[in-house]
């Protein structure tokens, strides 16, 4: 019996079996394909549709998903759909050196500290009139969180070393692969900042849950890698692409394809041209129940959310499936894998 996400071959064609929950995601704005917003995955289509609906509003947005799932792509699309005339600016908060994080974000006045030889506006002012993506927002140091809260509350920013705040008009989009609510409970992320940032929460699915999109992603990424038109893949190479779990998601796929194009030298891509982990991936086997103590961080978060929604909906699998944007059978599959009994949440 096929399960959601299973890949199979028929003749010269590869197929992926996907179960769809009821309902339509809604049409995306014109030009969405050019932005990279193409998918067969119902959950991802629903996420993009929700972003398109809130784009012209002031509703805050948090993008959640594993590294490489396309959070920056989604934020950039939100910016385009919003119609804001200013620039789109993305910053990886985890890559900001803590001593310089304030000046990088909020700007600095000349002479504020040793080495501040000139005025710098900072990324917040640079994105005024547009959209600022704070990727990995959970990594912000506590002092920076306080100043960011003021920006969101007062629509103004005070550069380091300046007593005079500057008015700004920007939309802040937060993105993270971590559980922000868990960080709040742990005391490492401010509760008031979390409340300010959180409005629409969008979860972007990992590539292993949307293998059906490989047929869209591979040609687009090959063009980006400068592959010759009509580049062919051997059946073994294509089979490996569908078999691999892609733990680092689209970013990993892009690197794998770039390597294969370079090694193929303009000829057909063979299995040996793919990265070793991809070409040596084992054949899929039926998924056995997982010991919760051995789950990855991403699966632990999914299990936690699944339990919370089952509790909220009294064990109603269909309601949980609708809220998560997946098919009912996918919820049943997760329940088996994560050893969660929906019946235990139903009233006696």
List PLM regions with ranges:
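C-terminal boundary/linker segments immediately following FHA domains
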Residues: 1-40
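Bacterial C-terminal helix-turn-helix
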Residues: 9, 255, 290-348
């Amino acid at each position: 019996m096929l399960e959601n996400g299973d890949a199979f071959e028929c003749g010269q064609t590869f197929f992926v079996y996907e179960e769809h929950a009821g309902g339509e995601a809604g049409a995306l704005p014109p030009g969405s394909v050019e932005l990279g917003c193409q998918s067969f995955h119902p959950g991802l289509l629903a996420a993009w549709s929700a972003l398109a609906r809130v784009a012209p509003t002031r509703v805050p947005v948090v993008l959640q998903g594993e590294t490489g799932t396309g959070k920056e792509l989604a934020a950039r699309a939100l910016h385009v759909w919003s119609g804001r005339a200013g620039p789109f600016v993305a910053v990886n908060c985890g890559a900001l050196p803590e001593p310089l994080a304030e000046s990088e974000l909020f700007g600095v006045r000349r002479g504020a500290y040793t080495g501040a030889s000139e005025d710098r506006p900072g990324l917040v002012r640079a994105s005024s009139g547009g959209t600022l993506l704070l990727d990995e927002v959970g990594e912000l140091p506590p002092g920076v969180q306080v100043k960011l809260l003021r920006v969101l509350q007062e629509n103004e920013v005070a550069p380091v070393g300046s007593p005079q705040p500057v008015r700004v008009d920007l939309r802040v989009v937060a993105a993270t692969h971590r559980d922000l609510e868990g960080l709040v409970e742990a005391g490492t992320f401010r509760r008031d900042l979390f409340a300010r940032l959180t409005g629409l929460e969008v979860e972007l699915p990992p590539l292993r849950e949307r293998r059906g999109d490989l047929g869209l992603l591979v040609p687009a990424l090959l063009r980006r890698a400068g592959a010759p038109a009509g580049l062919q893949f051997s059946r073994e190479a294509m089979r490996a692409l569908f078999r691999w779990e892609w733990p680092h998601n689209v970013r990993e796929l892009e690197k794998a394809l770039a390597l294969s194009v370079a090694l193929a030298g303009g000829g057909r891509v063979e299995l040996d041209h793919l990265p070793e982990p991809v070409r040596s991936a084992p054949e899929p086997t039926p998924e056995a129940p997982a010991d919760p103590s051995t789950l990855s961080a991403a699966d632990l978060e999914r299990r936690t959310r699944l339990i919370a929604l089952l509790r909220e909906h009294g064990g109603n699998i269909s309601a949980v499936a609708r809220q998560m944007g997946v098919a009912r059978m996918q919820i049943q599959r997760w329940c088996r894998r994560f050893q969660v009994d929906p019946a235990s949440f139903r009233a006696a």
